[in-house]
Amino acid sequence: MSLSFDPQAGLIVVPTRIWGPAGETVARLALDTGATWSLLSWDVAVLLGYDPSIVQERLQIVTASGVEFVPTIGLQKLEALDRTCEGFPMLCHTLPMGATVDGLLGLNFFQGHRLVVDFREATVTLD
């Protein structure tokens, strides 16, 4: 499946359908090949019925403000770029004020697949 994007926009935003205990939503996740893990905003996780505050499993990440330990949740289901994952592991973290996305699609989503970002055609393809 190919997704069109605006090469002048700065971020490549991937519409991502996510299911949780309280329902489903379409989140706006930035494609981020510099992120090892995919990340969902704390607010969206809570909206979907997850409670990141009670999660025992935490992963150390480095942010612009320092080192933090953030909860990891297993999503009921996630669909993006024609790929469906059940139990997909995702970090939860508060995003900065003014963020225009709901999180990041990182390398753990793309591993084992071929990702092509074509700036001439302004498309993203995941095989």
Label for each model-derived stretch:
Residues 1-127:
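Pepsin/retropepsin-fold aspartyl endopeptidases
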